[in-house]
């Protein structure tokens, strides 16, 4: 695989981490909460405002339990599709997050074996020239902060049976969310980073300790030479574990 295409693929794979919520210290403002994703009461009507939709999505994810996840570990398989190819490249992945810290490992030999670590201050990549999108500023991590000062929730067009809303922070980092009009679950989202658009579609979910976690999802990354696709299947989920001290250690 050509180097530029490989780097694009790796950058795309890093966005798989955006389905994992990464928590920064923050306090929520007054609003409905829930004790478990399965017990959440979701009310979405034709008159629901963008803020109502964001609150419904937050509640469906598990409410305050979703917000207060200390760390999350996902492991599973991934099938990669290069632009203009119907042949998949099978591999495995592991994602660990805690706050704004991240460790992601991808093994899709012989095409790519990759490790990315961010320890909260500095980052490490096993491949040069790969930039990590800040996971606390996009995706489900942004949904956690929908009601925080400095975050703006606005309307976007709905699509099919899904209601849409946009969350942006003070720096302009933006994610567009589309939620099920009945359950409030986030079914897809789009992020905009470094001039590119990354799309994620949720297929299946698991409820773990009152938190809704995607167990199967796909991603799409548009490039001038075509689109990358990746299908992820999560086989193991762990929340709020005691992590080893070197979980996010930067290699010497």
Which residues are covered by each model-predicted region?
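Bacterial N-terminal signal peptides that target proteins for export
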Residues: 1-9
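Boundary at the C-terminal end of the N-terminal hydrophobic targeting segment
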Residues: 20-22
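A short, amphipathic edge element
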Residues: 144-156, 194-200
């Amino acid at each position: 695989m050509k180097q530029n295409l490989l780097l694009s693929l790796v950058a795309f794979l890093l966005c798989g981490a955006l389905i994992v919520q990464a928590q920064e210290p923050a306090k929520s403002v007054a609003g409905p909460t829930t004790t478990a994703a399965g017990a959440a009461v979701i009310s979405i009507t034709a008159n629901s405002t963008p803020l109502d939709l964001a609150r419904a999505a937050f509640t469906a994810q598990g409410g305050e339990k979703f917000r207060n996840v200390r760390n999350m570990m996902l492991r599973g398989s991934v099938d990669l599709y290069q632009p203009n190819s119907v042949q998949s490249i099978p591999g495995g992945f592991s994602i660990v997050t805690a706050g704004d810290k991240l460790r992601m490992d991808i093994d899709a030999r012989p095409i790519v074996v990759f490790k990315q670590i961010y320890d909260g201050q500095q980052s490490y990549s096993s491949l040069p020239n790969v930039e990590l999108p800040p996971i606390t500023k996009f995706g489900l991590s942004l949904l956690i902060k929908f009601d925080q000062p400095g975050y703006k929730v606005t309307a976007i067009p709905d699509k099919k049976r899904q209601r849409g809303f946009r969350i942006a922070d003070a720096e302009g980092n933006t994610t567009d969310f589309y939620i099920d009009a009945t359950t409030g679950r986030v079914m897809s989202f789009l992020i905009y980073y470094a001039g590119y658009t990354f799309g994620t579609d949720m297929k299946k979910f698991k409820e773990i300790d009152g938190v809704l976690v995607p167990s199967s999802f796909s991603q799409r990354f548009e490039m001038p030479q075509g689109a990358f696709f990746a299908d992820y299947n999560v086989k193991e989920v762990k929340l709020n574990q005691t992590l080893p001290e070197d979980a996010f250690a930067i290699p010497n």
